[in-house]
From Swiss-Prot:
SUPFAM superfamilies reported for this sequence: N-terminal domain of the delta subunit of the F1F0-ATP synthase
NCBIfam families: ATP_synt_delta, PRK05758.2-1
Record localization: Cell membrane
Record's protein name: ATP synthase subunit delta
Membrane topology (UniProt): Peripheral membrane protein
Family affiliation: Belongs to the ATPase delta chain family.
InterPro entries xrefs: ATP_synth_OSCP/delta_N_sf, ATPase_OSCP/dsu
Gene name per UniProt: atpH
Length: 178
């Protein structure tokens, strides 16, 4: 993404986040953004909105479909995007909104990768560790199973990583032996 596109997406995202914070509607906006992103995660939808060959009115119709089940704040926000002909940036803007919401509220998704599934007790202890270590609050715990890490875990939250996996320890040992 070029600097101009990044700047535009940040401006739009920050404006929606500001409204969400002022109006105490962060959970609603968060849920709506996640719902919109669940549709926009489809590359075909992104390509449709970005295509110069497709008429602007057709793109607007697709974006207006999101408005049917959204709060007034999101409806107005989407309308501004349509008026400014920024439909092609909708996916990037929504991703940036999630990032900004997390930064402002210190509430993040925590991704945990383990070799085997975690018990409920382990999840609770891990969540407490991450919240304390990273000074954040958990929104969702996203669990991934990867038997290639052999043992231990890899935690990712707020662009930070704790890697205690056996695989990484073996790789580190290998590097030290060279």
């Amino acid at each position: 993404m070029d600097k101009k596109t990044q700047a535009v997406t940040e401006i739009y995202a920050k404006s929606l986040v500001e409204v969400a914070l002022e109006r105490d509607s962060v959970p609603i906006i968060y849920d709506e953004v996640r719902a919109i992103l669940s549709v926009l995660d489809d590359q075909q939808v992104q390509d449709f909105l970005a295509s110069k060959a497709i008429d602007l009115s057709a793109k607007s119709e697709v974006v207006r479909l999101f408005q049917e089940s959204c709060s007034n704040y999101m409806k107005q926000f989407l309308e501004i995007i349509l008026q400014n002909e920024r439909q092609q940036l909708l996916y990037l803007i929504m991703k940036e909104v999630l990032k900004e919401l997390s930064l402002k509220t210190h509430i993040f998704d925590i991704e945990v990768t383990t070799a085997v599934a975690l018990s409920d007790d382990q999840k609770e202890r891990l969540t407490a560790l991450v919240e304390k270590k990273f000074a954040l609050t958990k929104r969702n715990l996203i669990e991934k199973i990867d038997d290639e890490i052999i043992g231990g875990f890899i935690i990712k939250a707020n662009n930070k990583v704790i890697d205690t996996s056996i695989r990484s320890q073996l790789q580190e040992l290998k590097m030290n032996l060279k």
